[in-house]
Regions:
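Surface-exposed cleft-lining segments at the edges of enzyme active sites
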Residues: 109-131
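Structured beta-strand-rich core segments of catalytic domains in phosphoester-bond hydrolases
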Residues: 38-116
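Short amphipathic alpha-helices and their capping/turn segments at secondary-structure boundaries
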Residues: 23-25, 92-100, 129-131
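N-terminal, active-site-proximal structural segment of metallo-dependent hydrolase catalytic domains
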Residues: 1-53, 67-69
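Soluble or luminal CAZymes and related metallo-dependent hydrolases
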Residues: 13-17, 88, 122-130
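Generic low-complexity, intrinsically disordered sequence content enriched
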Residues: 29, 75-76, 128
């Protein structure tokens, strides 16, 4: 089995940073790129930009203005799983399986806010429930 290079980046809006991501992909040349907080719907992902760089395969779960996860791959993706946690469909977790059986999961875990108390802070409660 040949080595597999995986990179991960909380991009905080893939459309605003498509040129930065493209530059990184050219320099680092990972086999798989996981992006979190893409902040756009599936149909607005700039996938053509990444296909030109050799990332012919993609799995994604987008959400307008919030969250969103994207996996770009040079290798063929056989299976895609989209997960929901805590009863919310908030585009935070996607998993793929490659031809050689390797599975890759991309998660965007909630920040949880400033107050680490599940009773007083609903965002922190969501983070703890997610984990």
């Amino acid at each position: 089995m040949k080595p597999l290079a995986i990179a991960s980046w909380n991009i905080n809006s893939v459309r605003l940073r498509v040129e930065l991501v493209s530059r990184f992909l050219k320099l680092a040349d990972p086999d798989i790129m996981c992006l979190q907080e893409t902040k756009c719907t599936d149909e607005k992902l700039p996938l053509e930009n990444f296909k030109k760089l050799g990332y012919k395969y993609a799995a994604f779960k987008g959400e307008k203005s919030y969250n969103g996860v994207l996996i770009l791959s040079k290798q063929k993706i056989l299976n895609v799983e989209k997960f929901n946690f805590c009863g919310k469909d908030d585009a935070r977790h996607i998993g793929i399986e490659l031809e050689d059986g390797i599975k890759v999961h991309n998660l965007y875990i909630p920040a949880g806010g400033d107050l680490p108390d599940t009773k007083l802070n609903p965002k922190f409660e969501h983070k703890i429930s997610f984990l």
